């Protein structure tokens, strides 16, 4: 079957279901696809519960994650939806960024109210920077008493407020199972949930709208022309004759001008996020730049050496360490295109970290790296990946 061409006519938003085990995340996902397929058959196809629940294994930086991707459209938007069935899968996905979310649907069973994993998922969503959460209060067909539902709503709002999410976020009453079975009343509630997503999850900021940033992967000298650096543009756009800074790894940053942009052996006037290209740099010698530095719009980014990060440590089965590590552990931190050694400080009260754990740690790097909150990294020992994480706070 040929891959369908991705039509870029509507805004594209990445979304996901989060919440406690057995509260109905996967059933909610299946119900959304069914109800939208019934409402807009030309735009959507229904995905059965089983096809979502048997999530295929994905490898992201050597970590195995079971995760399902479905897509659907409302009149306003195109959504890519991720559902991580297992609790461990959810944590791994959030930290490694196998699927990034622009917004999340927190599924809470009205029969139970918020449970420990509900709280943990919301905390993790905040840590990894999911911008918006709204709520699907599921299994409402099983609760007769309005007062119970009101109490659950209050608890959910408190939980959102604790993590600085919108306390006034929509809480839509649903019965995912009834909607899946074709019940008209509950089908309407799923449409209301999608309307709430359309109206409340903000449009994501596209990478092209951010200031220019390209990590250097390779460096060449072209006789008579100068030094060319190659890499994939991560953010923003760049035009020929723009000034740029080369930052990170070395103590001092360097300023230069881009005199040529090349892609697939063709000369271009500009490059934008997603492009693999070569940049010809004025007056720069080959030894002035190295892999792992980044080319940026002047003043837009700064290199740092100290940060806090949220980390998932690979289990032995995933090819990680066989033994725990302790305070002052010194692995390499792989940012974008290069490894930098760092010293780990564990949080107060944490003696050691076991393979398979997730942990918040402070890191001091021996060389500066251009970073901001949300930047992902791998932790390596030699060529072996032993962990994955993301920057949650910059210290220095």
Curated annotation (Swiss-Prot):
Recorded hits in HAMAP family, A to Z, give: EF_Tu_B (MF_00118_B)
> Can you quote a single GO CC term?
cytosol
- Region G2: what ranges? 62-66
Question: According to the UniProt record, where is the region G4?
Answer: 138-141
Q: From the UniProt entry, list the residue stretches annotated as the region G3.
A: 83-86
The record's section on Gene3D superfamilies has:
P-loop containing nucleotide triphosphate hydrolases, Translation factors
Cross-referenced NCBIfam families? EF-Tu (TIGR00485), PRK00049.1 (NF000766), PRK12735.1 (NF009372), PRK12736.1 (NF009373), small_GTP (TIGR00231)
Q: According to the UniProt entry, what is the EC number of this protein?
A: 3.6.5.3
Known catalysed reaction(s)?
GTP + H2O = GDP + phosphate + H(+)
From the broadest rank down, the organism's phylogenetic lineage runs: Bacteria, Bacillati, Actinomycetota, Actinomycetes, Mycobacteriales
Task: Report any Pfam family annotated for this entry.
Answer: GTP_EFTU_D3
**Keywords assigned by UniProt, alphabetized:** Cytoplasm, Elongation factor, GTP-binding, Hydrolase, Magnesium, Metal-binding, Nucleotide-binding, Protein biosynthesis
Give the species this sequence originates from. Corynebacterium glutamicum (strain R)
Q: Does the keyword GTP-binding apply?
A: yes
From the Swiss-Prot or TrEMBL record, give the protein name: Elongation factor Tu
**Start and end residues of each tr-type G domain:** 10-205
The record describes its quaternary structure and partners as: Monomer.
Which family, according to UniProt? Belongs to the TRAFAC class translation factor GTPase superfamily. Classic translation factor GTPase family. EF-Tu/EF-1A subfamily.
Sites where the protein binds GTP:
19-26, 83-87, 138-141
């Amino acid at each position: 079957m040929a891959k369908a061409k991705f039509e870029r006519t509507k805004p594209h938003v990445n979304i996901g279901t989060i919440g406690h085990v057995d509260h109905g995340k996967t059933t909610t996902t299946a119900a959304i696809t069914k109800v939208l397929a019934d409402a807009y058959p030309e735009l959507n196809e229904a995905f059965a519960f089983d096809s979502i629940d048997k999530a295929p294994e994905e490898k992201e930086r050597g970590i195995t994650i079971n995760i399902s991707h479905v897509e659907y459209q409302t009149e306003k938007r195109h959504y890519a939806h991720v559902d991580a069935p297992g609790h461990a899968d959810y944590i791994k996905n959030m930290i490694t960024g196998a699927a990034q979310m622009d917004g999340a649907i927190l599924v809470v069973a009205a029969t139970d109210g918020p449970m420990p994993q509900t709280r943990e998922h919301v905390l993790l969503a905040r840590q990894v920077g999911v911008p918006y959460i709204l709520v699907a209060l599921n299994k409402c067909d099983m609760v007769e008493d309005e007062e119970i539902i009101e109490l659950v709503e209050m608890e959910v709002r408190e939980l959102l407020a604790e993590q600085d999410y919108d306390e006034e976020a929509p809480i839509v009453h649903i019965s995912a199972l009834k909607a899946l079975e074709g019940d008209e009343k509950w089908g309407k509630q799923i449409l209301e949930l999608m309307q709430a997503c359309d109206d409340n999850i903000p449009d994501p900021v596209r990478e092209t709208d951010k200031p220019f940033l390209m990590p250097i992967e390779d460096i060449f000298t072209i006789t008579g022309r100068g030094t060319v650096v190659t890499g994939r543009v991560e953010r923003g756009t760049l035009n020929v004759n723009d000034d740029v800074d080369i930052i990170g790894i070395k103590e001092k940053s360097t300023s230069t001008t881009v005199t040529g942009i090349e892609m697939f052996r063709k000369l271009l006037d500009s490059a934008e996020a997603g492009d693999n290209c070569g940049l010809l740099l004025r007056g720069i010698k080959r030894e002035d730049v190295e892999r792992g530095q980044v080319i940026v719009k002047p003043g837009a980014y700064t290199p740092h050496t100290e940060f806090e990060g949220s980390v998932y440590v690979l289990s032995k089965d995933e090819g990680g360490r066989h033994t725990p590590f302790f305070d002052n552990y010194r692995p390499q931190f792989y940012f974008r295109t290069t490894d930098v050694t760092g010293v780990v400080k564990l949080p107060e009260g944490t003696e050691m970290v076991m393979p398979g754990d997730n942990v918040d740690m402070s890191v001091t790097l021996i060389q500066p790296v251009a970073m901001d909150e949300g930047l992902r990294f791998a932790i390596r020992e030699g060529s072996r990946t032993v962990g994955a994480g993301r920057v949650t706070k910059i210290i220095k």
